[in-house]
């Protein structure tokens, strides 16, 4: 079952201007160290940050709150599997909100997709609830997400 859907569109040039103006103050407030290392290795640094910004906004919307109620930007972090697939991890308040919205007997799975076409970066986040398998039962309908 779908628990939440969120989307966001970010202007790469706006993020680039913000990076130029505020530098590390902006980076350290919004992005985890892993996100920063990833972005700084890319030729399109601003585009990489913009996609992650959009993903955090989209995730907060999928959680049903937007960026309020004590949520921290760093409570939501985007990384990538070896295949390149983006994944969203939540900690702190965002993880607490996710636990609250997940029905008993289910596990929450966060799906995220990112794209960009200069000057735009876009993200979609879907939060899905999958039934937990009974002890000793194999849940073939809902395979486990890929391991990182």
UniProtKB/Swiss-Prot annotation:
Molecular function, one GO term: holo-[acyl-carrier-protein] synthase activity
EC number: 2.7.8.7
SUPFAM superfamilies for the chain: 4'-phosphopantetheinyl transferase (SSF56214)
UniProt-listed InterPro entries: 4-PPantetheinyl_Trfase_dom (IPR008278), 4-PPantetheinyl_Trfase_dom_sf (IPR037143), ACPS (IPR002582), Ppantetheine-prot_Trfase_dom (IPR004568)
Residue ranges of the TM segments: none
Keyword Metal-binding (UniProt): yes
Gene Ontology CC entries for this record: cytoplasm
Cofactors: Mg(2+)
Record keywords, A-Z: Cytoplasm, Fatty acid biosynthesis, Fatty acid metabolism, Lipid biosynthesis, Lipid metabolism, Magnesium, Metal-binding, Transferase
Protein's GO biological process: fatty acid biosynthetic process
Gene3D superfamilies, alphabetized: 4'-phosphopantetheinyl transferase domain
Compartment(s): Cytoplasm
Binding site for Mg(2+): 8, 57
Family matches, as NCBIfam families: acpS, pantethn_trn
Protein name: Holo-[acyl-carrier-protein] synthase
